[in-house]
Regions:
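Long, charged amphipathic helices and adjacent flexible linkers at domain junctions
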Residues: 41-60, 126, 131-144
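Conserved AWS/pre-SET-to-SET junction and N-terminal core of the SET lysine methyltransferase domain
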Residues: 54-82
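C-terminal, non-catalytic macromolecule-binding modules
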Residues: 99-151
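A broad, low-specificity signal marking well-ordered, structured residues that form hydrophobic/aromatic
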Residues: 86, 102, 159-162
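Conserved metal-binding segment of the jelly-roll/cupin
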Residues: 79-98
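A short glycine-rich, His/Asp/Glu-containing loop-to-beta-strand
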Residues: 75, 139-170
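Long, charge-rich alpha-helical interaction segments
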Residues: 1-59
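Short, conserved beta-strand element in jelly-roll/cupin
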Residues: 62, 79, 107, 164-165, ...
Length: 170
């Protein structure tokens, strides 16, 4: 199966179309072979990206055979510490593996899933609306308008998050 790799965007769109097409040969067994290959690289110490291969291994346990595992393999892994933020532009596939976070997004009734869920995945809609671009993460540093408040301003004007920490008993 050849991907049109004339551009990254075209290649990623072709891959997503191939993965999520209901007639695709990307069967659960093929996904399991992919997971096994990542685990083998980890075990041999030959992984070019241990963090990504470990993610694939964990997702393979949680969501066996799910084509979303291959999508996760292609994503930029980002770790956030408490008090850190990242901005994801609209129409970009994103996910979190673990931890607690706040997601601020535009009012919408069209959450489209790319896998790793027991919920419905509308693959045709996913491929149609997703902007397949290889983008670096955009970290958002907080401003400190007061001693007790951090304010996160996203590159999109309509998004702002303020976190105020009160002293105990206040």
């Amino acid at each position: 199966y050849r991907l049109k790799l004339s551009t990254v965007r075209g290649g990623l769109r072709s891959l997503a179309t191939w993965l999520f097409d209901e007639d695709s040969p990307a069967t659960p067994e093929l996904v399991e072979e992919f997971v096994a290959a990542c685990r083998s690289r980890l075990a041999s110490g030959m992984s070019p990206s241990p963090r990504t291969d470990e993610l694939v291994s964990v997702l393979g346990e949680k969501h066996p055979g799910d084509p979303g595992i291959i999508v996760a393999f292609l994503m930029n892994p980002v770790s956030l510490r408490p008090g850190e933020a990242v901005y994801i532009p609209p129409r970009q596939i994103h996910a979190y593996q673990s931890g607690l976070g706040i997601e601020v997004m535009a009012s919408s009734d069209n959450v489209v899933r790319a896998g790793l869920t027991g919920k419905y995945v509308d693959s045709a809609q996913l491929v149609e609306i997703t902007e397949f671009s290889a983008l670096p993460p955009v970290r958002v540093a907080p401003e400190h308008p007061s001693a007790t408040t951090d304010r996160f301003l996203a590159p999109a004007q309509e998004f702002e998050l303020s976190v105020t920490t009160l002293a105990p008993g206040k």
